[in-house]
Structure formats: structure tokens, C-alpha cells
């Protein structure tokens, strides 16, 4: 898979404070790449560096294999790093005409981008009449002028109500299906898990882990091997617990009273567990493969509290 953005040993200091400490990772083309971390972890600083708003103290970054961010390259990137300054008394269409003029884009693109964000029917409505979600969709429409291949968003759902959050998340998935590579910073675990294909977790300027969302979810707390979480139950739950502790590949067994939660190596399938128990004379009444949440994995990695 080709890479649209490659970061190599990025460092950024603010006096004695290390905002970013030796950050390196690649963003695959066609991905929705989430940069996840608590507030103050360095996410916005990192986006500012790759967009040439801030200068790193050390390290390099490459857009499509070219070092730095030239003006020509930036034309291929739609960026929303802060709330755009739309005029409340003007319509959506007129606001986008101003944005198009500033960017040197054709007015003919305006109905196209409004259609993409599902605002074409409200193009003549004043910005002041828009809901929070609609305002953010208009901001994203502005980033789509010029039909960029890459979109960069900083906390795209920040401050929105639940309806607005759902609108923006679905829009990002739609844009990705249309071939856009999306890079987004977020402190919201649920958002990254539902929207992103890849994630880099940053804490206090340090890259803790990076990979596909599924790889990060499946990795063990020690990052030595991928693990599965399975719930099992049987009439003889005490006997079940005893035999499972003897099965190679079982990492831990927790008895909740009504069922057992086991953590196992990914190589140990649920069918092999079922067969093993049957051969030991225990028939399972429940065997459920549980999906590990990104919140749980985040806490394992950072040892801290999550921002939901």
C-alpha cells in the first residue's frame, strides 16, 4: 500500500517541554488515520508541523515521498484545523464563493461540494440558520474545494451535539469511500473506533502505538502478541476453570460467577477451545468471542483515564 504521509523522528519543544518526542509513522493512502490522545498530548502540534504552520525542532516529514509541504502539495490537501470564519448574514453559497476566491478555485465547484456534504438544498439559507452539524459540514465543504485527495481535520466533531457528531462521522466515512485519505486528530476513543481504519496513540508527545485499529485492539498489553477475549460457561464452572488454566495458549481466566472470561493467544481458536473442553468431559453452554474496545486498549497503553 502506498504512503501519503511519512513522519521521521519529529521533535518539537516549547522551552523545556517536549511537545513531540521522536514521532515516526506512515499514513497509508486511502485510510482514515486517527491521531488519538488526551488533550495536550501533541496532536494539534503534529498537524501544525505537517501543514507547515509550525516548525519542528528535528525530524522530517514527506507528503507523497516529497520532503516538506510545498505550496503545490498543499493544494492537494483540504485542511480544517480550526473553525473557519464564515459570515453569519451570508448564505452558504456566498460564503463558499469567498472561500473559493481566496483559494483561487472556480465557483462551478460550489454546488458539487455542497452536494457532497448534503447542503445543496440549503445553499441559499443564511449561515446563522444552520445547526451546529450543518455549520461543520459547510466547513468541510470548504476544504473540498479543489477536489483534494487528502483531508486533514483537527477534532472535527468537537463541540457538536450528538446529532451533529453522527452527521460528521458519517460524512467522513462517505468521503473515504469516495477515495479520500483522511487524517484526523481526536481525543474521543469512540470516534476513532467507529470512523478510523488506522490509529496512532500519542501521550505527552510520545508515540505509544500505531497500526490498523484492529491490530491495536488485538495486541496484548505487552505488545508481544495479539490476544482474544472469550466468555465461556458450563454447568460445572469450577471444573471448567480448572481445565482451561491447563490449556496452552490461555493467558488468564477470570471467574465472574456465572461465566468465565478468558484471554487467549490469537492462535487459539474458539473451536479448538470447545473441542478441548468436550474431550475433558465438559460441554460448554456459552462461548462468545468478545471484541476488545479501544477504550480498554487505550487504558492498557497509557495507564491513564480516557476521554470519552
For the regions a protein language model found, what residue spans apply to each?
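C-terminal coupling/interaction segments
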Residues: 264-308
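Short, surface-exposed acidic/glycine-rich loop or hinge patches that mediate macromolecular interfaces
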Residues: 67-68, 104, 207, 234-235, ...
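ABC transporter nucleotide-binding domain
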Residues: 170-264
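A generic structural signal for secondary-structure junctions
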Residues: 64, 101-104, 217-222, 249, ...
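ABC-family P-loop ATPase nucleotide-binding domain
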Residues: 1-11, 304-308
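ABC transporter nucleotide-binding domains
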Residues: 5, 12-184, 189-203, 207-209
